[in-house]
Amino acid sequence: MKDIALKTCTLMLIVAMMISLGCKKDRNPVQPSASDSFLPMQVGNLWYTNNQNYTEIKDSLVISGKLYYKFYSLIGGDAVSTSYLRIDEQGKLIASDPKYPDLKVVRADFNGKVGDKFFTTGQGNDTDNEVTITEKTNTQMSFSFDAIYHPNLKGHAYVVSYVKGQGFPGNWTKLKINGVTLK
């Protein structure tokens, strides 16, 4: 009788351990490697030239049910820019703003190919840009922006590039991506 009780107790203990270990939620999910993204997004990422010129991801927030990252930039020591960005399920870089949650601006399409075109807002007004993918390699993507609906800016395109695993190109004195200091 003692043997049966001991075996039953041991079996119950093993089953309880299996259940508790099997139902454990992963509290540290694996983050995508920085090298997998043309714009790695994690709070604390830093692109730094000096104390008057840098961009840092300061926070994350939800806009219209979607997670965005708050990019804070100081330019020339006195100009400030704040952008709220996310990469959607189709690989598009989307900008929005908590003050204007219905605003969605497509800034890049990382799944596109050279020659593909898209519009930033699709509204066909003077703030809408036609974007053309001009370069795509294993390490870099470039996008040409042309304000084709603006009477004075049409035909004066500018290019924005992204480096895989780094995000913004540049000769950074400090570069921190996904918790790893690269420079």
Region spans (language model):
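C-terminal motif of bacterial Sec signal peptides marking the signal peptidase cleavage site
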Residues: 19-22
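Conserved functional acidic sites
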Residues: 24-183
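Bacterial N-terminal signal peptides that target proteins for export
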Residues: 1-10
